[in-house]
Amino acid sequence: MEFNVVNLSGTAVSYNLSHVGMTESVSTSDPTHVAETGQLLDGGIKAEKVGGNGSLNGSKVTVDANGTLKVKVTYTLTNKDKSLIDSLFPYGMYVEGFIKLTAENSEEIDLNVPFLAFFGDWTQAPMFDKTYYEAAVLDGAAKWQ
């Protein structure tokens, strides 16, 4: 994904890039049901400068005074992450998270850019996932009162 980091101040600002990636987890009592809590992933990011005013050195982003820096970040799942998702969700599952820009100067604010993707075969995924609490009702074993 590509995004702009905009500096409206009269001095250069620097941020350290990091990330957090996650997917759904499954119920511990029945692994066929989504637990609606996050499962952290080990994937990594690769960042590159696309254009603009500033620099990108490793994970450090610096935006010149009154400048805009365009950055491209690619999030890549590890083989372990892919195996986990494949084992829990045969049709695939969402992968989501944040690209975090932590300001080096404590007077600046930290920034977060959300991302959302899908790993698997989108055309094979069911329209709805049953949660643990809905399973009995949807399977006809219980009735609404």
Predicted regions and their residues:
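Short, solvent-exposed loop/turn segments enriched in Ser/Thr/Gly
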Residues: 1-3, 88-98, 130-132
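Beta-strand-rich extracellular modules
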Residues: 76-78, 100-106
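Hydrophobic residues positioned within well-ordered beta-strands of beta-sheet architectures
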Residues: 1-3, 15, 71-73, 95-97, ...
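Surface-exposed binding patches on compact interaction domains or structured appendages
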Residues: 8-85
